[in-house]
C-alpha cells in the first residue's frame, strides 16, 4: 500500500526514491535496491525510473505544463547512462469518485479556439522560459515539417 496521497495502491513507496526535480503535474522516482534480493547494496539506485501523471482529480488530464514536465523527466532519464527502463504510469485514484485513469487526454478547460494555451496564472520558471526560447528559435517555415515527436519536444 502507498503511504503517499493520490498514489496507486500498487506503488510501494519504500522501493522508490523521489528524484530532485521541481514538478507539479508529474511525479518522478528512481527504483532502489532492497539488498541481496536485487543483487545490489540496499538503497542503491537500480536502472529503472517511474514517471507518473499526477493530476488524479482531473483523471490525469494533461495541459501544456504537464507536457513540458513529462518531456523534462524523459530527457533526464534519456541522459542518464545508468537508466535502462522507464515506467510511464499515473497516480490515482480520483478523490472525487475513487476512479483510476492513466490519462483522460487534454484538459478541455484550458483549450482555447487556437488550441491548448498555457495558463496565464502559472508562475514562470526557468524551465518554462527555456521552453519558450526553444519555440522562438524554430524557423516558421519548418513548423509544417516537424515530426510529432519533435513537436512534443518544444
Predicted regions and their residues:
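Conserved CoA-thioester-binding segment of acyl-CoA-metabolizing enzymes
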Residues: 2-98
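Glycine- (often His-adjacent) and acidic-residue-rich active-site loop
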Residues: 58, 90-152
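A generic local structural motif
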Residues: 72-75, 149-153
